[in-house]
Curated annotation (Swiss-Prot):
High-level lineage: Bacteria, Pseudomonadati, Pseudomonadota, Betaproteobacteria, Neisseriales
SUPFAM superfamilies referenced in this protein's UniProt entry, alphabetically: UDP-Glycosyltransferase/glycogen phosphorylase
Family recorded in the similarity comment: Belongs to the LpxB family.
Reactions catalysed, as given in the entry: a lipid X + a UDP-2-N,3-O-bis[(3R)-3-hydroxyacyl]-alpha-D-glucosamine = a lipid A disaccharide + UDP + H(+)
GO biological process, one term: lipid A biosynthetic process
Keywords annotated in UniProt: Glycosyltransferase, Lipid A biosynthesis, Lipid biosynthesis, Lipid metabolism, Transferase
Species of origin: Neisseria meningitidis serogroup A / serotype 4A (strain DSM 15465 / Z2491)
NCBIfam families found in the cross-reference section: lpxB
EC class name: transferase
Any Pfam family matching the protein: LpxB
An example Gene Ontology molecular-function term: phospholipid binding
Gene that produces this protein: lpxB
Protein name: Lipid-A-disaccharide synthase
């Protein structure tokens, strides 16, 4: 273990959303403990904060049951290596951010060796596989929850958990500012603008981007002046998007791919087509109407459909307790249906205004000083 004035904090993330949380956490910890050091698995944003990544985070960014099975030997090899490295380094605390199937296994092994463990972002145990709660309580010392309905599940099982709010709700302004967003991106104020968010992982891009681009072509026929914006989450996804856009069917599509800037892109848009996941919450906090879509391998879909315990898959719909925005999944994730649903938002501003009121209420519910609350909990577990 390190000197408590300069604790060694191990962190592991599996995808772009976890990288963002990790970067904010590092910053907040450094405000309280400037000499803290960070090591583990992280992405580009965490590295920019001085994080030492022992393995390539992109290698863990895999979705779906079938896709995970294909990459399982490599993922297990990375996990074994990370456990071995951290047992040698003896960090003061281990923080697994999201990616529960990977990080909870690491946490369990480290906890058995006396290293305090924290899991930041509860798995969706309220949606499916609720039986995991008891196991998670044994794997980690503490769970930091982003949604208010989560802590009680762990407390009822004898664990320690707390609601720290959602970092996006803290960081993003309550008020809308479409004009500034469009100026920033060089987009005309008077034209139809649609944002496309096909996912943060290369595997998601492979499934969703072609469908989203075909949807954009249909919208372009309906609105010839339309522009399309797509924020690339990582360099790897940007490269894959460029490869897909080289197909002849997408020639001439008025699409701008940005380096990240997802919030600015969403604020500039009239409506957003988004892959199910954390990005749906970001769109809601931007107060933008959206259509949620997702498409995975048939085997993965059949497995998930049997296990899911909630009527919706999109976070805004789950948190609001109703289908506030359309969800077009799997067989319904076709360009014709997606384009029609986006056009419905664009052509009905009264519906958009009502939705924005719902999203404002949701924003206020989730708004806390998340990074600082998480930093305080992590340092407490580290004995600082």
């Amino acid at each position: 273990m390190a000197d408590k004035k300069s604790p060694l904090i191990a962190v592991s993330v599996g995808e772009a959303s976890g990288d963002l949380l990790g970067a904010h956490l590092i910053r907040a910890i450094r405000k309280r403990c400037p000499q803290a050091r960070f090591v583990g698995i992280g992405g580009e944003l965490m590295k920019a904060e001085g994080f030492e990544s022992l393995y390539d985070q992109e290698r863990l960014a895999v979705r779906g049951f079938v896709e995970v099975v294909r990459r399982l030997p490599e993922i297990l090899r990375i996990r074994r290596g990370l456990v071995r490295d951290l047992l040698s380094l003896k960090p003061d605390v281990f923080v697994g951010i999201d990616a529960p199937d990977f990080n909870l296994g690491v946490a369990e092994r480290l906890k058995r060796s006396g290293i305090p463990t924290v899991h930041y972002v509860s798995p969706s145990v309220w949606a499916w596989r609720r039986e995991r709660v008891g196991k998670i309580v044994h794997q980690v010392n503490r769970v930091l929850c982003l949604f208010p309905m989560e802590p009680q599940l762990y407390l009822d099982a004898g664990g320690r958990a707390e609601f720290v709010g959602h970092p996006m709700a803290q960081l993003m302004p309550l008020e809308d500012d479409r004009e500034t967003a469009r100026k920033t991106l060089g987009v005309d104020a008077g034209i139809p603008v649609f944002a496309l968010l096909p996912g943060s992982r290369v595997s998601e891009i492979d499934y969703m981007a072609p469908v989203f681009f075909q949807t954009a072509l249909l919208l372009l026929k309906r609105y010839p002046a339309a522009r399309f914006l797509l924020p690339a989450a990582t360099e790897a996804t940007k490269r894959r998007l460029a490869e897909i856009l080289q197909r002849s069917e997408f020639a001439g599509l008025p699409l701008t791919v940005t380096d990240r800037q997802s919030e600015t892109v969403c604020r500039a848009a009239d409506a957003v087509l988004v892959t199910s996941g954390t990005a749906t919450l970001e769109v809601a906090l931007c107060k933008r109407p959206m259509v949620i879509s997702y498409k995975i391998s048939p085997l993965t879909y059949a497995y998930v459909k049997r296990k899911i315990k909630v009527p919706h898959v999109g976070l805004p719909n789950i948190l609001l307790g109703k289908e506030a925005v359309p969800e077009l999944l799997q067989h319904d994730a076709v360009p014709e249906k997606l384009a029609a649903a986006l056009a419905d938002w664009y052509e009905h501003p009264d519906k958009v205004a009502a939705l924005q009121q719902d999203f404002r209420v949701l924003h206020l519910l989730l708004k806390k000083d998340t990074a600082d609350l998480a930093a305080r909990a992590v340092l407490e577990e580290a004995g600082c």
